[in-house]
Amino acid sequence: AMLSGTQARIAIKLFGDDRDVFILSAPGRTEVCGNHTDHNNGKVLAASINLDAIAVAAKRDDMVIKEKSEGHNLNDVDISVLAPNESEYGKSAAMIKGVVAGLKEYGYNIGGFDACTTSDVMGGSGLSSSAAFEVLIATIVNHLYNGGNIDAVTVAKASQFSENVYFGKPSGLLDQMASSVGTFVTID
């Protein structure tokens, strides 16, 4: 994905131009073998691809995440209360909250941020757009609040937790691990 001038202007309009920003990304993935065995803790082989989700992100001084994806409404997520909410199942806001909750459960720092995102990983394409989005959110929290010190496996596990518990979709670890690690991966 590429950030266009229009998207940069949208980010400035929404979030201002007086803060330090990070530009972060997370790739989609392709399965090489074992996709459905992943749900049963079987062996799998997957790889990240050259299509990705990208964010321009900046810290906030509160426990609110404002995320604006290209072509979608603004997600305004209060992370001061991290309990899952069934009425949010299937929504991006649930993924955001779930990733943050997962990282907090692992003992990492969390906090609010503003992000303007875009993605070449199209929904429904079989390239794990939801995993790329979850890993992107975890990557933002990692760099804004944890100095980039959260390992790829923890990013993947927090993202899977989000998808399973907050988004309401059962999944193995294949999608999130391939996106988080960013190369060929085997899971056994």
Regions found by a protein language model. Name each.
Residues 1-131, 135-152, 157, 161-167, ...:
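ATP-binding N-lobe of GHMP and related small-molecule kinases
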